[in-house]
Amino acid sequence: MHRRRTAIAVSAALVAAPVLTACGETEHPGAAAVVGGERITVAQLEGRVKEVRAAQRAATPDDTQYQQTIARTSGLARDTLHSLVLDRVLDRAARDAGVSVSRRDVEQMRTNLEQQAGGARALQSIWLEQYGVAPRRIDDNLRTEVQAQKLSAALGADMSTTDGKATFWKAMAQASKELNIDLNPRYGTWDVQKSSRVDAKTPWVKEATVAAAPQPA
């Protein structure tokens, strides 16, 4: 089966040391992230998460199975924010490289994938279960897939090789830097070099837990 975001999903372990950015609630109230000066609000993020949860509920009428699905996708909000930010990074990298994606490009990919999956409903089920993508967002998701493929081609980056991956992620890192990405600390920080969200380190939580633990008599 076709893997979502062929280029985006490759390992970024080959890049240099991370540069992390995060924004505080007081700096950008109500923002889950600020990308290129534009806010992704907490309300927008929560709306996207609700779309996925509603689709999961509709696809899983059994309460026990639905609760298992929720437990399995407990990081949905953070994963969704990562995708929202990464889409914008990819847009910038593609624009820098002169890459564009047409509606026809997306339609052609969707048609091919539906044929492989066994129909439109089957594709929706796969994208929801495997990638946490609500049915109404599939075209947006496929656009990023086409965009990533076109970007790698424009860069002359063979994504099956280490050098090709390095070239691709260098362009993504530059785009991340240009966008000056800030994340609300509750969702982690943004690794500029890897173009990826990472969990914020909160050592004080561990320290507080240890301090609160009962001492032996």
What are these regions (language model features)?
Residues T69-D96, L123-P185:
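Solvent-exposed, amphipathic alpha-helical "stalk/arm" or coiled-coil-like segments used as scaffolds
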Residues H2-R4, A120, D140:
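A generic short-segment signal for beta-strand/edge and adjacent turn/coil regions
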Residues H28-Y131:
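N-terminal targeting/tethering segments
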Residues V106-N112, L142, P185-V192:
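Short linear loop/turn motifs
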Residues M1-R72, S176-A217:
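Short, low-structural-confidence N-terminal segments
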Residues A9, A43, R48, R53, ...:
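Residues in flexible loops and secondary-structure boundaries
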